[in-house]
């Protein structure tokens, strides 16, 4: 089974200060390793035997296309106002080829082995979410600053990898859309699971897998996390410190 890769290369509303520090107004076009960062995950996806084609979504698809070498497996489309609405549009499009692997233009360290491990871990799920465990990442990169979600048994950061196996995932995306504009959307989603889930999360009574299982039962879906062995899967380029770190990794200095 081969996936259709969805690469999100959009921009935040308003001025992107990070991008402007590097001479552009789009984060996907910031140079990493001497080339626009979006090229790196695109090249990795096209080289993966797990991927049949790649759809790149952006508010300015022509600008993204202008920096990507042509390939018949590539398709460029305009994204909607939000990520959730963009994904709902894909769910409702009869031309969408399932399953989908969703990642982002700032995943500059994505490699074929990460994709392969994630896809194997996502088998038989309806939704799978790639994560990296805190201890593994900090062992590799002790000074890396990431956002950590803490649960009983461990803390995790996201790996910007999501597997959506069929249109059955639509209720989960609708739930995401309902909280997408909330700055504390993670807590809002947990609140929607009910007081037991909220209290359990606050007190760290649940593991990550247990909380995702609760969400899955609420939605009638099989949802789980795939903990990736390569800590670099948890590193994206979202701020100047990330850019410095990734450049150091690519140059073999970190």
Question: What residues fall within each predicted segment?
Answer:
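N-terminal nucleotide-binding beta1-loop-alpha1 segment
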Residues: 1-23
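Short catalytic helix/loop segments, enriched in acidic residues and glycine
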Residues: 22-40
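Short internal beta-strands
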Residues: 39, 54-59
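Short, acidic, metal-binding catalytic loop of nucleotide-sugar glycosyltransferases
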Residues: 44-51
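Short, charged/polar "capping" segments at the starts of alpha-helices
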Residues: 61-66
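Short phosphate-binding loop-to-helix
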Residues: 67-101, 109-110
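Conserved core of the sugar-phosphate nucleotidyltransferase
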Residues: 110-217, 228-232
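Short, conserved phosphate/pyrophosphate- and ester-handling motifs at nucleotide-, phospho-/glycolipid
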Residues: 239
């Amino acid at each position: 089974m081969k996936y259709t890769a969805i690469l999100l290369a959009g921009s935040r509303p308003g001025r992107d200060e990070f991008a402007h520090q590097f001479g552009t107004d789009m984060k996907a076009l910031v140079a990493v390793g001497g080339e626009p960062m979006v090229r790196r995950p695109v090249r990795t996806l096209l080289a993966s035997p797990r991927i049949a084609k790649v759809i790149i979504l952006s508010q300015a698809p022509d600008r993204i296309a202008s920096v990507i070498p042509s390939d018949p497996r590539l398709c460029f489309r305009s994204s909607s106002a939000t990520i959730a609405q963009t994904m709902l549009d894909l769910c409702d499009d009869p031309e969408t080829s399932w399953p989908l692997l969703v990642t982002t233009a700032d995943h500059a360290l994505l490699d074929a082995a990460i994709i392969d491990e994630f896809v194997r871990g996502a088998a038989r799920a309806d939704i799978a979410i790639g994560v990296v465990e805190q201890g593994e990442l900090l062992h590799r990169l002790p000074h890396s600053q990431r956002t950590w979600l803490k649960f009983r048994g461990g803390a995790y950061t996201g790996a910007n990898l999501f597997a959506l196996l069929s249109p059955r995932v639509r209720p989960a995306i609708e739930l995401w859309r309902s909280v997408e504009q909330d700055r504390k959307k993670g807590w809002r989603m947990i609140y929607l699971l009910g007081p037991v889930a909220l209290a359990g999360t606050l007190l760290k009574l649940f593991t990550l897998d247990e909380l995702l299982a609760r969400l899955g039962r609420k939605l009638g879906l099989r949802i789980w996390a795939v903990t990736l062995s390569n800590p670099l899967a948890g590193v994206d380029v979202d701020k100047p410190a990330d850019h410095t770190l990734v450049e150091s990794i690519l140059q073999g200095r970190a």
